[in-house]
Amino acid sequence: MVFEGHLVGTGLKVGVVVGRFNEFITSKLLGGALDGLKRHGVEENDIDVAWVPGAFEIPLIAKKMASSGKYDAVITLGTVIRGATTHYDYVCNEVAKGVASLSLQMDIPVIFGVLTTETIEQAIERAGTKAGNKGYESAVAAIEMAHLSKQWA
């Protein structure tokens, strides 16, 4: 037997957690995610968005959303751009670990849509220019994974 999710979001309830730090990028990721959800049939009133200060704070609110029983999937969006210190490494590692851990602990998909880039140009490219919009891609993944995970409910 082959299991796969389909890309119809009708009837799905989705939570989105967005880091405000680098908002000029994360707002574009959010726009892409909202566009992706709506284009695939998720109703606007079935989407809740929570803004957090930065990427490091994403896992806590994603956990609260995922454990609420209200959502079929949670999308995490943020942008971490390497600077001159090791702060980048700590933030990236902890956010990735936090979201990955939630994905395994929760009964719903928690999608990692956090950009971790070396340069601001790379972040801009992934927020809707040359390299597509990772927010949109995260929305599509959330829809597919929500349906796929329900096959084992």
Swiss-Prot record:
GO cellular component: a single term: riboflavin synthase complex
Annotated S-S bridges: none
Pathway: Cofactor biosynthesis; riboflavin biosynthesis; riboflavin from 2-hydroxy-3-oxobutyl phosphate and 5-amino-6-(D-ribitylamino)uracil: step 1/2
Record has Transferase as a keyword: yes
GO biological process, one term: riboflavin biosynthetic process
UniProt KW Transferase keyword: yes
Gene3D superfamilies reported in the protein's UniProt record: Lumazine/riboflavin synthase
E.C. designation(s): 2.5.1.78
Record key words, sorted: Riboflavin biosynthesis, Transferase
Chain's role: Catalyzes the formation of 6,7-dimethyl-8-ribityllumazine by condensation of 5-amino-6-(D-ribitylamino)uracil with 3,4-dihydroxy-2-butanone 4-phosphate. This is the penultimate step in the biosynthesis of riboflavin.
Entry-linked NCBIfam families: lumazine-synth, PRK00061.1-4
Subunit structure: Forms an icosahedral capsid composed of 60 subunits, arranged as a dodecamer of pentamers.
Protein known as: 6,7-dimethyl-8-ribityllumazine synthase
